[in-house]
Amino acid sequence: MARFTLPRDLYHGKGALEALKTLKGKKAIVVVGGGSMKRFGFLDKVVSYLKEAGMEVQLFEGVEPDPSVDTVMKGAAAMTEFGPDWIVSIGGGSPIDAAKAMWAFYEYPNVTFEDLCIPFNFPTLRTKAKFCAIPSTSGTATEVTAFSVITDYKKGIKYPLADFNITPDVAIVDPELAETMPKKLTAHTGMDAMTHAIEAYVSTLHCEYTDPLALHAIELISEYLIPSYNGDMDARAKMHDAQCLAGMAFSIALLGIVHSMAHRLVQLTAADISFMDVQTQCTCQRLSASTQQSQKHR
């Protein structure tokens, strides 16, 4: 038996951010990374829309790239003190991943990080809060997945946390946020999305539900990544959708050796994970092609 878990609601297209006005609750904590969401005015919009929904709002700012266990614990403590019934995270993969882990510690203060590192071992969430994810980059697709990546810097290890419980309740995929990405980030996240789609398609766990998502993501990325890199904002919107489709596919079909290798190499080299994904993807494809060729001549 297989399971296909996605957010209950996914709002997409320009202006989708306004869907925050429809959330029902009393308190919302907004988890955010660096200053880009504030600088471009999106953080103010999020706070305004949540207040319009009748909620008291508190910010947890400064989630670093490759979020740490320490940051997760600080965020969980802030949530415990504030008592939100909505956790809203906006930004790239890092603040959303961090907020997912914070959510678990907020609802279960006595759980350990080691407990959460066991795949599909999370306690049942949503006893205190629901989760809304708003991506600003077009790569990780953590807004629709059952995964989070947290780094234990004391051990020098990036831990992938996996459980259907941490699939967000609401995802808001608004391309206006992605329009602010610089060219380098557009390229790296776009290739990260392509890697997700390819790995999902060739996964041994792929199925009739994941293949159409992965294939269409590959088609969209092939057509729109370069125009998106060159500043075409319609293409940028297509890429924002494509990375989300890739995320839906790999959340079910899972990833493979490419990401396993890339995560370890990032620890050794401090390179960007998206860049390393591309390098290992190319290496694995060459290896696969040479293996298939040699088998033909046996």
Task: Label every PLM stretch briefly.
Residues 147-253:
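Carboxylate- and glycine-rich phosphate/diphosphate-binding segment that chelates Mg2+/Mn2+
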Residues 70-176:
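Glycine/threonine-rich beta-strand-loop-alpha-helix active-site module
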Residues 8, 14-15, 33-34, 63, ...:
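Fold-independent oxyanion-binding glycine-rich loops
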Residues 267-298:
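Gly/Pro-rich interdomain helix-loop hinge
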Residues 9, 28-29, 58, 85-88, ...:
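Structural motif
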Residues 1-86:
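ATP/NTP phosphate-donor binding region
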Residues 139, 244-275:
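Glycine-rich phosphate/pyrophosphate-binding beta-alpha loops
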